[in-house]
Amino acid sequence: MPNLRKGHIDYLKERGVTSELLHSNYFSDSDHLGIRYLKPDGKPYKDSKGDDYVVRRLFPTGKPKFNAPIGSGSRPYFSPLMPEGYLEDINIPLVLIEGPVKVDACYQAIPTGFCFVGLTGTWNTKDRRDEKGNWDPATDTRLL
């Protein structure tokens, strides 16, 4: 995987992620591992500043382990390994998973038969911000 430090490559391999198809999604950002989030059409989401929506896996490991763009809400992660048409086919089971690395590892282990979609955290039940990062209290339903 180009543009990745050895420690980041090792981290991904330990978790079952080895595909060269993912080289544009994962990159080393200083000491941290950057993970670019893509829409189902393969184009990157944008954060509140207009930059690509990138979640960083912080190294060394601490709390938090991941850092999302400030003021940009949450985004689902759609893997470039997802077969075309999976989101439209209601006969394919949808599996929600916490985190992009696990999604990519699942597609490498089980390439067909399931539609894996990643969430940035299991506590994220409703994103209260719009695409520009603005919050409207009138639309906040506080799902539990």
Report the location of each language-model feature:
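Phosphate-handling DNA/RNA-contact segment within nucleic-acid enzymes
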Residues: 30-144
